Curated annotation (Swiss-Prot):
Protein family (similarity comment): Belongs to the methyltransferase superfamily. RRP8 family.
GO cellular component: 90S preribosome; chromosome, telomeric region; nucleolus
PANTHER family attached to this UniProt entry: RIBOSOMAL RNA-PROCESSING PROTEIN 8
Phylogenetic placement of the source organism: Eukaryota, Fungi, Dikarya, Ascomycota, Saccharomycotina
Protein name: 25S rRNA (adenine(645)-N(1))-methyltransferase
Other observations noted: Present with 2780 molecules/cell in log phase SD medium.
Annotated CDD domains: AdoMet_MTases
Record's compositionally biased regions (Basic residues): 27-38
Length: 392
């Protein structure tokens, strides 16, 4: 196959023919030189254009250069303002931090187990304070609260949580009574009792707690007098007494001896407040400060009455000089009583009736027997049982 024989490409040949470097033509060299020349020219043009751009950019005024061109006076003023602001900020910063710390105290969220433990502790603390107040006299209770004022707040925190579970709050019942009876004229049948001359309704809340009764009554009469005609407006005053001044409405006092003159009140309220072992002294004080035909309103927990209905309690208050009006026992948790202080003419009529029936001596002996019994055993142990919660 001579036609396909190519020099250097024969399979049979032992040597392979390679291209020789020296055999390159001068044309190839010229082409390479031209290409290199073009590259150098393009690089030079690029470098020149970049240099021009740099010069143009440098000629444009920057923010720093503009700031340098501002007059020195304005710059000095701005510097002074900035330094004064910094000083004020530095001085006010710690004060603001203190305020924030006071206004926003860090509160750690308790776990469910910790919440249960806290509830048990507060409950046991409330029960202990409650037992103390029911089993000591009023002067001892006043001394205790003066020495440890935090006990008053702890007790009322626990008491508030207890009453919230009740179907009805006795304070609300008393406020509703005042609202309802206020619609009738003062001293009229079914109306509220007022002082004889001024017809002012004067209420004494004995053992007021946080004086919620005074707050609600004041708000009611304020709104009532705004809408009422001039001749229908009501004059009123509320005195609130307890062992600690929890707010401005309260006067600190032992409620067996309050700073009020004789016959200066028309309604005296004991709302779950007959707590001391000497609570009949509170009743005597109520009789002293009540005006004739003034009313005594009492609400007490049902479990305190040994007979379940409070008949023995009513009889004891009759011996103290009060006339019984009505007992309200429809509530599951507490019983309400209404008494009034008879005027002198009714007392005289009653005395004459008892003499005709030859029972006056019997009544006097019953009073003496009651006082003798009180001297031996405090009425807080037999007439009204202390409200002591079961230990768990």
């Amino acid at each position: 196959m001579a036609l396909f024989n190519v020099e250097g490409w024969s399979i049979k040949t032992k040597t392979v023919a390679f291209d020789n470097k020296t055999n390159k033509s001068s044309k190839d060299k010229k082409k390479n030189n031209r290409k290199n020349g073009k590259l150098t020219r393009e690089q030079k043009l690029k470098e020149e254009t970049e240099a021009e751009l740099k010069e143009q950019v440098e000629d444009i005024p920057s923010e720093g250069s503009v700031a340098k061109d501002i007059p020195k006076k304005n710059q000095e003023k701005s510097d002074q303002n900035e330094t004064s602001k910094k000083r004020k900020h530095d001085e006010e910063a710690p004060l603001m931090q203190v305020k924030e710390n006071i206004e926003k105290p860090t509160k750690k969220q308790l776990t469910p187990l910790q919440q249960k433990m806290m509830a048990k502790l507060t409950g046991s603390r409330f029960r202990w304070i409650n037992e103390q107040l029911y089993t000591i006299s009023s002067d001892e209770a006043l001394k205790l609260i003066k020495e440890q004022p935090q006990l008053f707040d702890e007790y009322h925190d626990g008491f508030r949580s207890q009453v919230q579970a009740w179907p009805e709050n006795p304070v609300d019942v008393f406020v509703d009574q005042i609202r309802y009876r206020c619609m009738k004229p003062v001293n009229a049948p079914g109306g509220l009792p007022g002082l004889k001359d001024s017809k002012e309704i004067v209420i004494a809340d004995m053992g007021c707690g946080e004086a919620q009764l005074a707050l609600e009554i004041n708000n009611f009469f304020k709104n009532y007098n705004k809408k009422a005609k001039k001749y229908l407006k009501r004059r009123h005053k509320v005195h609130s007494f307890d062992l600690k001044k929890a707010n401005e409405r309260i006067t600190v006092a032992d409620i067996r001896n309050v700073p009020l003159p004789d016959e200066s009140c028309t309604i005296v309220v004991f709302c779950l407040a007959l707590m001391g072992t000497n609570f009949l002294d509170f009743i005597k004080e109520a009789y002293r400060i009540l005006a004739p035909r003034g009313e005594l309103w009492i609400a007490e927990i049902k479990s305190r009455f040994s007979d379940g209905k409070g008949n023995e309690f009513v009889d004891a208050l009759k011996l103290m000089g009060f006339f019984h009006k009505k007992t309200f026992d429809e509530n599951k948790m507490f019983t309400r009583f209404e008494f009034f202080k008879p005027p002198a003419e009714i007392i005289e009529e009653r005395r004459q009736k008892l003499e005709r029936r030859q029972k006056f001596i019997e009544v006097e002996t019953e009073k003496e027997e009651l006082e003798k019994k009180r001297r031996k055993i405090a009425e807080g142990k037999w007439l009204l049982k202390p409200c002591i919660y079961k230990r768990r």
